[in-house]
Design a protein with these regions (language model features):
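A short SAM/SAH-binding and catalytic strip from SAM-dependent methyltransferases
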Residues: 155-180
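Rossmann-like AdoMet
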Residues: 1-81, 88-136, 143-144, 148-156, ...
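Conserved Class I S-adenosyl-L-methionine
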Residues: 204-215
């Protein structure tokens, strides 16, 4: 399996980001998934606690969005780019649906961890031919552009980008302009947002804040 590693994840840049995290006392989210062991632990935790795994209503929301996208995209050729693909389970469900509808599919799983993109690639193996899968390691928060992520997209393919469960890792004012810059006419973006419960945002944040208390 060939994995492309963007310069944002070259050792000198990772070291710079780690030092910046220590100096600012704010750990960059990518260091939660840096090693193989961390990736395995995160995937195990996600499997047990993620609403997309444990809540039928949540899973139905994803499935409904997949069905809507598959129905509305008229192109026969679709290249799915999973931004922050994680273990690739959601992307694989979407790819399976597109495949069942007779679409010619390709897949670029992208994340900050080599281990993570390989897990996603393996998850998609049952649906996407190995020669049509292009694992790509990058840091979307990098000031450098990540246009290389599209290097394997056929000119005749419609680009379908997914951005699932990622927004809590970024400040909106940082990531939203980057997402907008990546999109071109006729692209599609499926984006999940983590919302605080209830109509009172401040009260909703206080309800979920204990979930992030790791002490």
């Amino acid at each position: 399996v060939s994995v492309v590693i963007h310069s944002s994840q070259f050792p000198e840049n990772v070291r710079h980001d780690l030092l910046q995290s220590l100096r600012s006392r704010q750990v960059n989210h990518k260091f939660h998934y840096d090693s193989i062991k961390q990736t395995q632990k995160w995937l195990a935790l996600h499997q047990v606690y993620s609403p997309s795994r444990t809540d039928e209503d949540c899973a139905a929301i994803y499935d409904g969005s997949f069905a809507a996208a598959a129905w509305q995209i008229a192109s026969r050729q679709i290249h799915l780019i999973g931004l922050g693909c994680g273990g690739g389970q959601k992307d694989t469900r979407l790819l399976k649906l597109l495949n069942e509808q007779g679409k010619e599919i390709s897949y670029t799983p992208s994340d900050v961890s080599v281990a993570m993109v390989l897990v996603a690639q393996q998850a998609a193996n049952s649906v996407v031919a190995p020669e049509r899968c292009f694992p790509f390691v990058c840091d979307l928060a990098s000031p450098e552009g990540v246009d290389e992520i599209f290097s394997n997209v056929d000119a005749n393919s419609t680009r379908l980008l997914t951005f699932f469960g990622m927004i809590p890792n970024f400040e909106p004012q940082l990531i939203l302009p980057k997402l907008a810059a990546m999109l071109r006419p006729n692209d599609w973006l499926l984006f999940s947002a983590n919302l605080a419960p209830g109509n009172d945002y401040s009260a909703g944040v206080q309800r979920i804040l204990p979930l992030y208390d790791n002490e």
